Amino acid sequence: MIYTECTDPDVRVEEDYVVVSDGVSLRTIDFTPPCDTPERPMVIFVAGWISLISGWKDVLKKVTPRYRTLYVETREKVSARFPERAHVDFSMPRMSLDISEILERKVVPEKRVCFAGSSLGSTVILDYLSMEVRQPEESILIAPICELTYPFWLPLLLRPVPPSLYTAIKPLLKWYLRNIRLDKHKEPEQVKKYGGALDAAEPRRLKANAFAIKDYSLWGKLPDVRSPVLIIGAESDTLHGLDVMNRMAALMPDADMEMMSSNRETHSEKMGDLIVEHMPGLKGMER
């Protein structure tokens, strides 16, 4: 993909693969604007489950010309490269370890960082933050998922289905998102976006990841998240429970919650402006 839609012409863009400790290669896209300096903070952006970077172009377009931004693609994405004949771990602890290792490889220790993420990416970030690891200045997290539970019928449906038949059940997954989890009347663009992400997903990884994170919970880890967190919810979002996010914020020592009007707005330029506004400032430095 050409990343011109995600940034300005004078921003340097470098696509790279980071080989993590279990041999998996994860794609990163590093946006570096001319204004970046060693003292200027940067953004580490981790998107949601099977999310495509094209779905975040409006957000990135606002952030990348102002701050170096490292966009990280998690291991369930089709871009990840796996060692031959290897059993790949898709669990949450492994995914948060990926963040730690990418940070170690791509960002010097002196560089101040802020995390941004969405949905499952936000969950991975919170799992990472709960450990004794390098901490960011702040994390801005859209609709984190606190516990990964599925409708009782979904594992029963998916477990016996080989990945080769993913095409056959994909319409059912789209129907579930469109009619149960999303507002197809108010946000048809989001329905289209999630449908496109399902179309682009790699079936074997999708299934393996879904079962590896099944029944995962953040509840016991949230009190250990000590660095500042801003949770972003959407008033019309039925995919991520607002009551749950409020409870999550209450359990963290330094967390706040802010609302946007819709899921679409959390993927808009307004979200990019919010990230810029929350970046830590330096004396005499423009945002």
Regions found by a protein language model. Name each.
Residues R27-F82:
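Conserved HGGG/HGGXW glycine-rich cap/lid loop of the alpha/beta-hydrolase fold
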Residues S130-M131, P136-L165:
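Flexible "cap/lid" loop of the alpha/beta hydrolase fold
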Residues Y150-P151, A168-L222:
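Conserved alpha/beta-hydrolase catalytic His-Asp/Glu region
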Residues G117-I125:
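Gly/Ala-rich beta-loop-alpha elbow adjacent to hydrolase catalytic centers
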Residues D254-R287:
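Catalytic active-site module of serine/aspartate enzymes centered on a nucleophile-bearing elbow/loop
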Residues Y71-A116:
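Active-site loop/oxyanion-hole signature of alpha/beta-hydrolase fold enzymes
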Residues V225, I231-G233:
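Short beta-strand/loop motif that positions the catalytic acidic residue
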Residues T238-V244:
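Conserved alpha/beta-hydrolase "acid-adjacent" motif
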